[in-house]
Regions:
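Fe(II)/2-oxoglutarate oxygenase catalytic core
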Residues: 1-201
Protein backbone atom coordinates (compact mmCIF):
# COMPACT_ATOMS: atom_id res chain seq x y z
CA UNK A 1 0.00 0.00 0.00
CA UNK A 2 1.51 3.32 -1.06
CA UNK A 3 0.63 6.52 0.79
CA UNK A 4 1.23 10.09 -0.32
CA UNK A 5 3.89 11.04 2.19
CA UNK A 6 7.67 11.38 2.37
CA UNK A 7 9.17 9.61 5.38
CA UNK A 8 12.20 11.93 5.32
CA UNK A 9 9.88 14.76 6.40
CA UNK A 10 8.82 12.98 9.60
CA UNK A 11 10.03 14.67 12.80
CA UNK A 12 11.66 11.41 13.88
CA UNK A 13 13.72 11.34 10.65
CA UNK A 14 15.62 14.45 11.75
CA UNK A 15 17.24 12.85 14.79
CA UNK A 16 16.20 12.25 18.40
CA UNK A 17 12.49 12.90 18.78
CA UNK A 18 10.01 12.82 21.62
CA UNK A 19 6.32 12.59 20.83
CA UNK A 20 4.16 15.38 22.24
CA UNK A 21 0.68 14.83 23.67
CA UNK A 22 -0.78 17.48 21.36
CA UNK A 23 -2.49 20.77 21.97
CA UNK A 24 -5.97 20.94 23.41
CA UNK A 25 -7.14 22.71 20.25
CA UNK A 26 -6.06 19.65 18.25
CA UNK A 27 -7.37 17.06 20.71
CA UNK A 28 -10.96 18.29 20.70
CA UNK A 29 -13.45 18.11 23.52
CA UNK A 30 -13.94 15.18 25.89
CA UNK A 31 -16.94 14.16 23.81
CA UNK A 32 -14.85 14.29 20.63
CA UNK A 33 -12.22 11.99 22.12
CA UNK A 34 -14.78 9.49 23.38
CA UNK A 35 -16.87 9.42 20.21
CA UNK A 36 -17.01 6.12 18.34
CA UNK A 37 -16.99 6.73 14.59
CA UNK A 38 -18.56 4.60 11.90
CA UNK A 39 -16.58 3.61 8.82
CA UNK A 40 -18.64 5.94 6.63
CA UNK A 41 -17.99 8.87 8.99
CA UNK A 42 -14.25 8.26 8.86
CA UNK A 43 -14.31 8.06 5.07
CA UNK A 44 -16.20 11.37 4.96
CA UNK A 45 -13.40 12.84 7.10
CA UNK A 46 -10.81 11.83 4.50
CA UNK A 47 -9.75 8.41 5.74
CA UNK A 48 -9.31 5.54 3.30
CA UNK A 49 -10.84 2.12 3.98
CA UNK A 50 -8.36 -0.63 3.13
CA UNK A 51 -9.73 -4.13 2.65
CA UNK A 52 -7.48 -6.64 4.45
CA UNK A 53 -7.92 -10.28 5.42
CA UNK A 54 -6.03 -9.85 8.69
CA UNK A 55 -3.58 -12.63 7.81
CA UNK A 56 -1.55 -11.65 4.75
CA UNK A 57 1.39 -9.33 5.60
CA UNK A 58 1.09 -5.99 3.80
CA UNK A 59 3.80 -3.28 3.92
CA UNK A 60 2.80 0.38 3.84
CA UNK A 61 5.30 2.48 1.88
CA UNK A 62 5.90 6.18 1.31
CA UNK A 63 6.18 7.85 -2.10
CA UNK A 64 9.80 6.67 -2.42
CA UNK A 65 9.08 3.03 -1.60
CA UNK A 66 10.34 3.17 2.00
CA UNK A 67 8.47 0.94 4.44
CA UNK A 68 6.90 3.12 7.13
CA UNK A 69 4.44 0.63 8.64
CA UNK A 70 3.38 -2.99 8.21
CA UNK A 71 0.14 -4.89 8.59
CA UNK A 72 2.05 -7.88 9.93
CA UNK A 73 -0.76 -10.41 9.67
CA UNK A 74 -0.50 -13.67 11.56
CA UNK A 75 1.19 -17.04 11.13
CA UNK A 76 -0.61 -20.11 9.87
CA UNK A 77 -1.96 -22.76 12.18
CA UNK A 78 -3.72 -22.23 15.50
CA UNK A 79 -2.60 -18.64 16.05
CA UNK A 80 -6.14 -17.24 15.87
CA UNK A 81 -7.39 -19.59 18.56
CA UNK A 82 -4.34 -18.76 20.68
CA UNK A 83 -5.17 -15.05 20.45
CA UNK A 84 -8.67 -15.83 21.71
CA UNK A 85 -7.21 -17.98 24.47
CA UNK A 86 -4.94 -15.11 25.56
CA UNK A 87 -7.87 -12.67 25.50
CA UNK A 88 -10.04 -14.92 27.67
CA UNK A 89 -7.16 -15.54 30.06
CA UNK A 90 -6.52 -11.81 30.46
CA UNK A 91 -10.22 -11.14 31.03
CA UNK A 92 -10.46 -13.80 33.73
CA UNK A 93 -7.26 -12.70 35.46
CA UNK A 94 -8.45 -9.08 35.47
CA UNK A 95 -11.85 -10.06 36.85
CA UNK A 96 -10.36 -12.31 39.53
CA UNK A 97 -8.04 -9.47 40.57
CA UNK A 98 -10.88 -6.95 40.84
CA UNK A 99 -9.72 -4.83 37.91
CA UNK A 100 -12.26 -2.76 36.04
CA UNK A 101 -13.54 0.74 35.30
CA UNK A 102 -14.16 1.45 38.98
CA UNK A 103 -10.94 -0.04 40.37
CA UNK A 104 -8.13 2.24 41.50
CA UNK A 105 -6.01 1.09 38.54
CA UNK A 106 -8.52 2.31 35.97
CA UNK A 107 -9.71 3.91 33.81
CA UNK A 108 -6.49 4.78 32.02
CA UNK A 109 -5.78 7.80 29.82
CA UNK A 110 -5.72 5.43 26.84
CA UNK A 111 -9.21 4.14 27.51
CA UNK A 112 -11.82 3.03 30.01
CA UNK A 113 -9.74 0.16 31.34
CA UNK A 114 -6.76 -0.45 33.66
CA UNK A 115 -3.29 -0.75 32.12
CA UNK A 116 -0.52 -2.68 33.86
CA UNK A 117 3.15 -2.45 32.86
CA UNK A 118 5.89 -5.00 33.33
CA UNK A 119 9.53 -4.86 32.30
CA UNK A 120 12.19 -2.17 32.13
CA UNK A 121 12.01 1.59 31.59
CA UNK A 122 14.36 4.53 31.53
CA UNK A 123 11.73 7.23 31.63
CA UNK A 124 10.61 9.58 34.40
CA UNK A 125 14.08 11.09 34.84
CA UNK A 126 15.92 7.88 35.68
CA UNK A 127 19.66 8.05 34.84
CA UNK A 128 19.76 4.31 34.07
CA UNK A 129 17.31 1.50 33.24
CA UNK A 130 15.09 0.41 36.13
CA UNK A 131 12.45 -2.23 36.66
CA UNK A 132 8.84 -1.11 36.40
CA UNK A 133 7.13 -1.52 39.76
CA UNK A 134 3.70 -3.17 39.45
CA UNK A 135 3.30 -3.11 43.25
CA UNK A 136 0.37 -5.34 44.24
CA UNK A 137 -0.08 -6.77 40.73
CA UNK A 138 3.27 -8.57 40.49
CA UNK A 139 1.77 -12.07 40.64
CA UNK A 140 -0.89 -11.21 38.06
CA UNK A 141 1.70 -9.86 35.63
CA UNK A 142 3.94 -12.87 36.16
CA UNK A 143 1.05 -15.13 35.19
CA UNK A 144 0.30 -13.04 32.11
CA UNK A 145 3.83 -13.03 30.70
CA UNK A 146 4.17 -16.71 31.54
CA UNK A 147 1.08 -17.77 29.59
CA UNK A 148 1.95 -19.77 26.47
CA UNK A 149 -0.44 -17.87 24.18
CA UNK A 150 0.86 -14.48 25.34
CA UNK A 151 4.42 -15.66 24.75
CA UNK A 152 3.46 -16.81 21.25
CA UNK A 153 2.13 -13.33 20.44
CA UNK A 154 5.31 -11.68 21.69
CA UNK A 155 7.53 -14.02 19.70
CA UNK A 156 5.57 -13.49 16.49
CA UNK A 157 5.72 -9.72 16.92
CA UNK A 158 9.44 -10.04 17.55
CA UNK A 159 9.90 -12.05 14.34
CA UNK A 160 7.80 -9.63 12.30
CA UNK A 161 9.82 -6.69 13.64
CA UNK A 162 13.09 -8.37 12.68
CA UNK A 163 11.80 -9.24 9.21
CA UNK A 164 10.36 -5.87 8.20
CA UNK A 165 12.70 -3.47 10.04
CA UNK A 166 16.00 -5.36 10.36
CA UNK A 167 18.25 -2.35 11.00
CA UNK A 168 16.05 -0.93 13.74
CA UNK A 169 15.62 -4.41 15.16
CA UNK A 170 19.39 -4.86 15.32
CA UNK A 171 19.70 -1.61 17.27
CA UNK A 172 17.03 -2.81 19.71
CA UNK A 173 18.83 -6.15 20.05
CA UNK A 174 22.19 -4.54 20.78
CA UNK A 175 20.71 -2.29 23.47
CA UNK A 176 18.73 -5.19 24.94
CA UNK A 177 21.73 -7.52 25.10
CA UNK A 178 24.04 -4.85 26.53
CA UNK A 179 21.53 -3.88 29.20
CA UNK A 180 20.87 -7.43 30.34
CA UNK A 181 24.57 -8.32 30.33
CA UNK A 182 25.30 -5.54 32.84
CA UNK A 183 22.15 -5.22 34.93
CA UNK A 184 19.98 -7.75 36.72
CA UNK A 185 16.62 -6.71 35.29
CA UNK A 186 13.44 -8.68 34.55
CA UNK A 187 12.87 -10.03 31.06
CA UNK A 188 9.28 -10.60 29.99
CA UNK A 189 9.84 -12.80 26.96
CA UNK A 190 13.29 -14.41 26.69
CA UNK A 191 14.44 -14.56 23.09
CA UNK A 192 12.74 -11.30 22.13
CA UNK A 193 14.06 -7.73 22.18
CA UNK A 194 11.10 -6.02 23.86
CA UNK A 195 12.06 -4.30 27.12
CA UNK A 196 8.53 -3.92 28.47
CA UNK A 197 4.92 -4.87 27.90
CA UNK A 198 1.63 -3.11 28.58
CA UNK A 199 -1.48 -5.14 29.34
CA UNK A 200 -4.80 -3.44 28.62
CA UNK A 201 -7.24 -5.15 30.95
CA UNK A 202 -10.57 -3.78 29.77
Amino acid sequence: IEVETDASEFDAARGAHTGCPGRKSHMGTKADKEKEYTVSELIDMGFKHIQWDGSTPVPIIDCFGRIIAVLAGQPEGSYGSELHEAFCFMQKEASDSGLGKKSKEGPHKCGLFPVLLRGVTMGMGNPHPVSLNPKTMTHLLNRLVGHAAVQRMAKYQNSAFGLWAPRIYEEYRNVHDTMHSKLNLPENFPGTIFAAAAFNLG
